[in-house]
């Protein structure tokens, strides 16, 4: 569906506010913080239109709005801009991963540790032998989505139910370099507030695996995506050295 420029800017503002706060977003908050040049009344009208078009939804207990998976997809594809990683972070990540390049197991442990630390999420990797590596399990407890013990138990239980994790990763399709799954796209009820970002990583010309992060569906994709891509590239580079 076509959106006006004002609707696109409003959707971007609502999603970024939701990423920051984890709370439904109201017109007053947008008017005060994002300087869109329109009144709260006009913002409310446009929010209703975005809801009708399927980009936003309204929780029953709130007058505010939250993005749908469709809205988040549009934001990631067209509205947001990936951030440039700090040079110091790139150097630190590269040094830590490259220092373990002689042993695949240690290299992947270092890679998921770097992702977990930089993204403050759960980092994970699967090698060509379906060996699972992960780090940062305590990080997800910093996110309100994981205050629900059932959600946290289900996510951590995926590491004991490997076929289920493989099934989730296998749901990604298309030719995107980085695959993203979140929200209503998840078939399991306890995963609908979570997000998975992962990418194929080539260890050698003949072998490959998967690396990525698990966190809230509203994760800051502006920084998460470049970190996942960068770590993937360094792991692949280590395999060629």
Place the predicted regions along the sequence by residue.
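Alpha-helical hairpin
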Residues: 2-3, 38, 67, 85
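Residue-level marker of regulatory loop/turn positions in helix-turn-helix DNA-binding domains and
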Residues: 3, 23, 144
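Conserved RecA-like P-loop NTPase ATPase core
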Residues: 10, 68, 213
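Contiguous, well-ordered alpha-helical segments that form the cores/surfaces of helical PPI scaffolds
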Residues: 11-16, 195-199
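Intrinsically disordered, acidic Ser/Thr/Pro-rich low-complexity regulatory segments
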Residues: 73, 80-241
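N-terminal helix-turn-helix
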Residues: 13-16, 20, 24-78
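Short alpha-helical segments that sit at the start of domains
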Residues: 1-12
């Amino acid at each position: 569906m076509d959106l006006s420029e004002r609707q696109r800017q409003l959707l971007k503002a609502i999603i970024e506010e939701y990423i920051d706060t984890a709370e439904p977003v109201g017109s007053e908050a947008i008017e005060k913080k994002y300087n869109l040049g329109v009144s709260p009344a006009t913002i409310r009208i446009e929010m209703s239109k975005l809801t009708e078009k399927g980009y936003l939804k309204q929780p029953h207990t709130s007058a505010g709005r939250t993005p749908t998976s469709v809205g988040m997809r549009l934001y990631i594809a067209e509205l947001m801009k990936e951030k440039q990683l700090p040079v110091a972070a790139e150097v630190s990540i590269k040094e830590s991963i490259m220092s373990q390049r002689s042993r695949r197991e240690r290299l992947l442990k270092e890679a998921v540790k770097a992702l977990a630390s930089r993204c403050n999420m759960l980092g994970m990797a699967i090698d060509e032998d379906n060996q699972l590596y992960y780090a940062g399990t305590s990080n997800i407890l910093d996110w309100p989505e994981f205050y629900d013990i059932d959600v946290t138990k289900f996510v951590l239980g995926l590491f004991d139910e490997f076929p289920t994790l493989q099934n989730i990763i296998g749901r990604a399709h298309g030719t995107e370099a980085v695959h993203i799954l979140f929200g209503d796209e998840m078939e399991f009820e306890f995963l609908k507030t979570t997000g998975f970002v992962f990418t194929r990583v080539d260890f050698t010309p003949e072998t490959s695996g998967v690396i990525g992060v698990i966190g809230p569906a509203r994760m800051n994709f502006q920084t998460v995506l470049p970190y996942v891509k960068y770590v993937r590239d360094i792991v692949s580079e280590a395999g060629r050295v």
